[in-house]
Amino acid sequence: AVFNEEITSVDFTQRPFRLGAGSGKSYTAGSIIAATGAQARWLGMPSEQKFIGKGVSGCATCDGFFFRGKEVCVVGGGDSAAEDALFLTKFASRVYLVHRRDALRATFRLVEKLRTNPKVEIIFEHTPEEITGEAKVTGINLKNVKTGAVRRLETPGVFIAIGHTPAT
């Protein structure tokens, strides 16, 4: 059987295992598969939270097709960000990859794919300052980490790709 319920306790000292659920129910099982999942890690900006589902996404494969023919921005510098940026080139007319450092942390193979893709522009040494818009995202303000200068990108889509937090 499969239960979609929060398990709050497990007693592994006896068989069958005893599980306690948040609802107060208890279960027994001969074996257990823990599939806790993970959630996208967010930047923590108020404007980011305001626009989740309205142009801000933590899942390029889920939401990329909404931005067919449009310019989008991916925030991050690791493998997840590189993979998201490359995936988004299937839909977007241009993909800006924004990273706070002067080099990406992604693997060499992914970095080479990014550098040779004409749809990708990497913006180094910038951090998101504010995501702007009214009902939906219209752009993102990026701050240069060395000079403090602010640059604006007009875009309806901002993908946050800075990792995931395990749901444990």
Residue ranges, per PLM feature:
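Residue-level detector of short coil/turn "hinge" positions at structural boundaries
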Residues: 1-2, 40
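A Rossmann-like FAD-binding core segment of flavoenzymes
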Residues: 2-21, 26-29, 90-168
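Portal/gating segments that form or line small-molecule/metal binding sites
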Residues: 32
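Conserved NAD(P)H cofactor-binding loop of Rossmann-fold oxidoreductase domains
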Residues: 36-37, 162
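Glycine-rich dinucleotide-binding loop and its adjacent helix/turn
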Residues: 38-91
